[in-house]
Amino acid sequence: MINPHLLDELTRRGLVAQNSDPVALADHLATPRTVYCGFDPTAGSLHIGHLVPLLMLRRFQLAGHTPVALVGGATGLIGDPSFKATERNLNSSETVQGWVASLSAQIKALLPASEGLAAPLLVNNADWMGQMSALDFLRDIGKHFSVNAMLVRESVRQRLARPDQGISFTEFSYALLQSQDYAVLNQRLGCTLQIGGNDQWGNITSGMDLTRRLHQAQVYGMTLPLITKADGTKFGKTEGGAIWLDPALTSPYAFYQFWLGTADEDVYRFLRYYSFMPLTEIEALEAEDAKRQGRKLAQQVLADELTELVHGKGALAAAQRISELLFSGEVARLGESDLAQLAQDGMPGWRIEGETDLVTLLVESGLANSKRIARELLAAGAISLNGEIRREEPLRAADRLFGRHLLLRRGKKQYRLVTWQG
């Protein structure tokens, strides 16, 4: 069943930055269409910057259209230079192939087949580019591109303006490769709409032009906004780096905490971008939060929605449990897998061998600058061990969680996860 109001809803959510022909595209989407978005493998996992375009494909699927996710097994060997200050490092074919496999698995999980909806398609542009010779590429694709027009593109001009960097022919040719993707998908799958980030507008319009030249097809392009925070800074990274979708790189607990930390100025906008909550429910939540004193509900809703979407109900429950137990101080109820998540997330740790006493441990782990200060902290009740205030120095075997862990805390926020080796 086609949703005739899809473009209007996407616009009201703030998800449309540029649209090649808003009126014609709205008419075009009145019947089932095929839409694609490309994802180049630049690492072994997608990160939250990929979520908005990936979820956009899901929105089109729910509206009655066929989504196509393209993983760039060929373009990933080159790297998109769009608005990059320096030349990308080239990765080996083996590395890129491994990344393609990882990203494909993540995309399948987030873009599932659903009863009554068009089945999502996953393609790899290495399947057609790998079979094309350089001569064929130059004759069949290159002849349709004007170097004059390519040189005035903003992303190219920025690089040419830097004599210390410039742009290689390899990266200069990237737009031709992405354009060929659109033409191939139009011919093979009937794809008539490409979506992508706002920095992809030049590549998308080039692909539209090539497709029209090669196949005389009417095709469209649409970009999504660059996601920034209210203060204008780029969204999606922390001091520790990117927020990955792979739980081995960013644990579900850290993922959950990231969304809980969303600023009040951003949270309702991010609910419109990242969640499938109806706009009326988001507006009602914002109105309810405006009446509340203290912490808003929206951050909790956002964290719950996104953690369950990416990691599942079980991981959400674990993240909620860890958060609750750390906040309440009932850390003795943490499971060993919970402690492993905390260690993965970068909770400061300390590994020791053999026996020690609490004063020495406080100093060696960095929670106290000297043994005198350590004893003063203990006497003042400022040190907790596994969630309980500790005033005594001796450590007992029974203090160890699962026989090998201690969770020390000084004050409210300074934690050390101590682990006995062996």
Swiss-Prot record:
The enzyme's main class, written as a single word, is ligase
Described by its record, this protein's role is as follows: Catalyzes the attachment of tyrosine to tRNA(Tyr) in a two-step reaction: tyrosine is first activated by ATP to form Tyr-AMP and then transferred to the acceptor end of tRNA(Tyr).
Fetch the InterPro entries from UniProt: aa-tRNA-synth_I_CS, aa-tRNA-synth_Ic, Rossmann-like_a/b/a_fold, S4_RNA-bd_sf, SYY-like_C, Tyr-tRNA-ligase, Tyr-tRNA-ligase_bac-type, Tyr-tRNA-ligase_bac_1
Domain named S4 RNA-binding is located at 356-420
What PANTHER family does this protein's entry cite?
A: TYROSINE--TRNA LIGASE, MITOCHONDRIAL, TYROSYL-TRNA SYNTHETASE
Q: What is this protein called?
A: Tyrosine--tRNA ligase
- Lineage of source species: Bacteria, Pseudomonadati, Pseudomonadota, Gammaproteobacteria, Aeromonadales
**Membrane: present as a keyword of the record?**
no
> Which Pfam families does this UniProt record tie to the protein?
SYY_C-terminal, tRNA-synt_1b
Q: Return the motif ranges for 'HIGH' region.
A: 41-50
- List the ranges annotated as motif 'KMSKS' region: 234-238
UniProt: L-tyrosine binding residues: Y36, Y174, Q178
Species assigned in the record: Aeromonas hydrophila subsp. hydrophila (strain ATCC 7966 / DSM 30187 / BCRC 13018 / CCUG 14551 / JCM 1027 / KCTC 2358 / NCIMB 9240 / NCTC 8049)
Which GO MF term does the entry hold, naming one?
A: ATP binding
GO CC terms: cytosol
| Gene name linked to the record | tyrS
Q: Where does ATP bind?
A: K237
